[in-house]
């Protein structure tokens, strides 16, 4: 099967997984098949040669997230970093007054997956978060905000968990897990070249919110929302 056919099959499965008209079983089956096919494609497409040859394929993209560090934007970019790491990419970010700019380094194929799964996540989580908020009680607005942030971070963690489980199952006894680990390390080294990257402080976590988000993220039918893998990135509001 050619690369283009594999990618189209992955996209078709992910469209089914995100189709609200499909049954839960159909969406879950499509999602699992898409994840396994994606992981297998990533493994089989690993380039040959030494590390320096593979470094040539390293590149970067930027994602702008609207909102200050005190808004939901900080939780979204934290989730993006979690998702990027699960796909062997390294994410750092710079905070501005009204937005955050994340820079993600990795191979072109891995960055394409990060982009599409990220786009799917930011479309999917708001309605699920709204459902959770309807049944939750809070003593203060700050507690409510902490729950919302924690939920978003947990949602991305749930998606990353599924990717990592599928990757482990596919790379068992093949040695390719070491190659993927090396790919992340090279992405991190590439990001740090000539830059003094300061790691952000952890946000205060609401454990119930994080656990709820992680369950929903793991169980979500994340679809392939975007067909365009190149070109400028569109700022995504984080309210």
Show which residues each predicted segment covers.
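Long, charge-patterned amphipathic interaction tracts in eukaryotic proteins
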Residues: 5, 39-239
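Long alpha-helical, hydrophobic tracts
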Residues: 1-61
């Amino acid at each position: 099967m050619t690369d283009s056919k594999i990618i189209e099959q992955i996209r078709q499965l992910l469209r089914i997984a995100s189709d609200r008209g499909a049954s839960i079983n159909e969406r879950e089956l499509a999602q699992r098949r898409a994840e396994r096919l994606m992981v297998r494609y990533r493994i089989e497409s690993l380039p040959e040669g030494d590390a320096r040859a593979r470094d040539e394929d390293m590149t970067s993209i930027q994602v702008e997230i609207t909102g200050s560090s005190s808004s939901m934007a900080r939780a979204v970019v934290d989730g993006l970093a979690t998702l990027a790491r699960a796909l062997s990419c390294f994410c750092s970010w710079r905070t501005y007054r009204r937005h955050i700019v994340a820079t993600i380094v990795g191979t072109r194929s891995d960055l394409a997956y990060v982009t599409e799964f990220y786009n799917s996540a930011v479309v999917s989580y708001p309605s699920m978060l709204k459902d959770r908020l309807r049944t939750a009680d809070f003593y203060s607005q700050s507690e409510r905000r902490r729950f919302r942030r924690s939920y978003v971070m947990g949602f991305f963690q749930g998606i990353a968990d599924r990717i990592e489980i599928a990757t482990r199952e596919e790379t068992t006894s093949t040695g390719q897990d070491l190659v993927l680990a090396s790919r992340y390390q090279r992405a991190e080294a590439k990001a740090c070249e000539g830059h003094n990257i300061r790691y952000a402080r952890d946000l205060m976590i609401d454990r119930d919110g994080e656990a709820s988000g992680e369950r929903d993220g793991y169980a979500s039918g994340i679809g392939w929302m975007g067909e365009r893998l190149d070109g400028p990135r569109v700022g995504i509001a984080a309210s």
